[in-house]
Amino acid sequence: MARSRSRSPRWKQRSLSPQSRNFEYHEERHFHGHYDPEYRHDQQRPFTWRMDDEKHGQNKPRIPPRVNSYHRSYVNRSPSPNVKPVEKFDTYKPHQEYFPGRGDDDRRSQYMPTYTESAATYMEHERDCYIPTVQGRYTPDDHRGRGRGSGRGEKPPQMSLGKPPKMSLGKPPQMSLADSLRFKEKWHEDELRHQRVQEESYPQSPRRGSEDFGTRNPFQKRYPEDHDFRKYGYTSKRPTDAARYENRDPARIPKWKPEHSFLPFQEKKEEWSFGAQGHRYTEREYPERSSTTRVSYDYRHKHHKLSESEQDFPDGRFHKHLKEEDRKYSSIKAPANRELDCFSTTRGREIENEQINGPFYLYNKNSVSYNHTNIKDADLEPCNDKWKKKISKEDCRKENASFSKQFDTSPKPEEKCYSLIKKKPLSVKVDRNKTDTFRSTSRYSAERQISHDLVAIGKTSDNFHPVFQHLDSTQNPENKPTEEFAQEIITLIHKVKADSFVTPDITLNERFSRIKNRQDADFNQTKSNSDPEFHRRIDMSLDDFQNKYTMVYEPDKTLVKVIEPNDLRHDIERRRKERLQNEDENIFHMASPTERNHQSPSFSKVKTIRADGFQKPPHFIKSNFRKFIQKPYINYTMQRKDAIDQKIFRVEENHQNRRGSKGSFKNFLGGRFQPHYKSHLVQKSMYIQAKYQRLRFAGPRGFITNKFRNRFLRKKKEYPVLPRTNNLELLQVEPTLYEDLTEHLIFVRNWN
């Protein structure tokens, strides 16, 4: 199908439907648009249409004339004048409207992917609906002449008053006034009927919503200097509603009323005779039309009266955009309620006032949720002050008159506006005295709490503490204070306790005294080998604790002093000692648990006498002998220059800190210092045995080094017999010898 070849950057058609336009659509829209035959045959505006077109900025030099290119694309494509659009209105899709700012088909094809979601749904209703020879955006020649050639200031030669429609190549047929009226009546009726059919199939319109407009608006990106495109470009859902409600703002603004009074429908005929409003007489001369038809036709002129949108949009695009407005207003389409579109034609005629005033009321409630221009207009600033910044005063007068024109279809527009103004303060005014009972104290700020306290000062009661006055005054000053409620709770608790829980006659002191006396009486009868789990004295006095009993604890008849075995405080310690004893039995020797804790003052002097005459160190731990040859007394060589008496005690301290009880036997045996308790012969023999034993177990992990080995061998050769104690070398070798002797003695005793 042929498409328009217009290459103007400002004239790019874009439609919501994937199907191209054909002539029947434009023919019917032509007879229903601004510059239809009714408008040109109007006797009251023979010359004002040129002024109006020039005023709307269509003759701007930045809009190049396109008369020749347009007619060249539609040569030999004019349809027959006998074709009537009513025959195929059952398949007409009301969503096929032209959006101003969309451009020709070449631009529409450029942005077609944005409508892929709605393409399949519209194909079945749009295919084979119109004559396929002329497709795309086609506007009658007189539209083109005004919209392109010389700023719509030249009246097309094809139209003259009283003449029948005339056909020429590349130009649409022009019909008489009666035919135009008949076409418009049928068009409105069928349009509403098909809109109902389509919206029943698609209760929510698949068109782009307002959320898509901000990110998918190519005109804002391509022509950022045209600020009006943000409001009216592409007529997406949001800008269309913004423009629609913006035009009604002066009806609700009190400052607008003295300048633009909204007269009844018949009284405004003389006012419209002026040049700025002359092109809207067509509708007013046919009041016999149905209310729904008037509603659709009224809102068709909405964008035409705004010069800031007409300055940037040619006539043809504005023509198609008004069809979108008819479809919206015929079904009372609010921006947030698209699902309410399913209105029948009969219902639309019955509720004419609702169709006209419904959007006003919705805007009064939801003015904040709409476009930002609505918020600015609702700020009690006259709309003409804002528009005077962009257009002349003549345009403002035309727009103001067109505002009043929209209200003419309602019976009493002044009463509607005043009723809305009276309702508005009710939504703003708040009765704080009533809302106090529904809000908690935590929701109020400090200032609001103070204000409520001041108001409720006279209502406060005197039966509660002043601390709670601030909290209770905001909610209910007559309520009982918090402390009284707490006191009642406490009283109930005491009452229940006195009734249900009888206190015993015996005190705690008496009860524990009885237990103590009974245990003291039975203490002598307690067996020594009784189970501690059943016979434990948990209330042992200090005297009993200090009283120690002697008993046979080990099978080898080792006499130890122990405390009462049934005492719970010593049970854990006793078990720990037994566990350590069992571990030692697996190694070499079984020792008494008291022998391990030699540091205890109670057991420091306990001794066991062996048959060989040697005293057994009570604090000696019997463990693996190899542990004693792994890096033992390395500090002996570091302290050889010290005095012997100081060195012995220092070595004792270092070894007790480093190895625990492993080296504690060297200098203290049985709690007393005994360095020379053996004879000289015994010491020599033990030294030799310890030396060879050390050399036997010396290895890479041992404590013996070559230095010590060489020294010991040299000392052995030079001194076959130990020298006297006054020899200086003896003082140097004595720590090592004493260490060797002690280790040898330990080894011998363990070996036996």
UniProtKB/Swiss-Prot annotation:
- Disulfide pairs? none
Compositionally biased intervals (Basic residues): 1-13
InterPro entries in the record: THRAP3_BCLAF1 (IPR029199)
- Record bears the keyword Phosphoprotein: yes
Which subcellular locations apply to this protein? Answer: Mitochondrion
Can you name a GO cellular component term? mitochondrion
Q: Which UniProt keywords apply?
A: Isopeptide bond, Mitochondrion, Phosphoprotein, Ubl conjugation
Glycyl lysine isopeptide (Lys-Gly) (interchain with G-Cter in SUMO2) cross-link position in this chain?
K416
Q: Where is this region: Disordered?
A: 1-114, 132-177, 190-252
**Positions modified as Phosphoserine?**
S15, S17, S78, S80, S205, S592
Q: Family, per the entry?
A: Belongs to the BCLAF1/THRAP3 family.
Q: What's the protein called, per UniProt? A: BCLAF1 and THRAP3 family member 3
Gene name in the database record: Bclaf3
